[in-house]
Amino acid sequence: MAKKLVGSMKLQVPAGQANPSPPVGPALGQRGINIMEFCKAFNAKTADMEQGAPCPTVITYYQDKSFTMDIKTPPASYYLKKAAKLSSGAKTPSREVVGYVSSKQVREIAEAKMKDLNATSIEAAMKIILGSARSMGIEVK
């Protein structure tokens, strides 16, 4: 018989740095998920990613206290800030330009994000990344 689904939740956890402290521990604990088991599994799955990169994670948990997790690639904003060497985006993106990225960097970001984007071609994925860059006040040269 199939496991009975109880619910799902979304967390953004730094790659390779999941630990039982807040916000991860309490969020999992109140749903009855084994916190240490999650931390070990998450850190093992994200070992090959850049340490500290924020990873959006969808955790589906079942009645028997088991869980599955779907780890996505870091957000486009993380990659864009890293490429432009910024700490944050523009306060007024339509009027202020805070950094620049090359079209080659946009292509690399689109290739890295391709599996999580709703795009069929690399060009469509690049347009999505360009929109994110524009909304952050980052210009493409």
Curated annotation (Swiss-Prot):
HAMAP family: Ribosomal_uL11. GO terms for molecular function: large ribosomal subunit rRNA binding; structural constituent of ribosome. Belongs to the universal ribosomal protein uL11 family. GO terms for biological process: translation. One or more lysine residues are methylated. Part of the ribosomal stalk of the 50S ribosomal subunit. Interacts with L10 and the large rRNA to form the base of the stalk. L10 forms an elongated spine to which L12 dimers bind in a sequential fashion forming a multimeric L10(L12)X complex. SUPFAM superfamilies: Ribosomal L11/L12e N-terminal domain, Ribosomal protein L11, C-terminal domain. CDD domains: Ribosomal_L11 (cd00349). It comes from the Bacteria. Pfam families: Ribosomal_L11 (PF00298), Ribosomal_L11_N (PF03946). Keywords: Methylation, Ribonucleoprotein, Ribosomal protein, RNA-binding, rRNA-binding. NCBIfam families: L11_bact. Forms part of the ribosomal stalk which helps the ribosome interact with GTP-bound translation factors. One of its GO terms (cellular component) is cytosolic large ribosomal subunit. InterPro entries: Ribosomal_uL11 (IPR000911), Ribosomal_uL11_bac-typ (IPR006519), Ribosomal_uL11_C (IPR020783), Ribosomal_uL11_C_sf (IPR036769), Ribosomal_uL11_N (IPR020784), Ribosomal_uL11_N_sf (IPR036796). This is Large ribosomal subunit protein uL11.
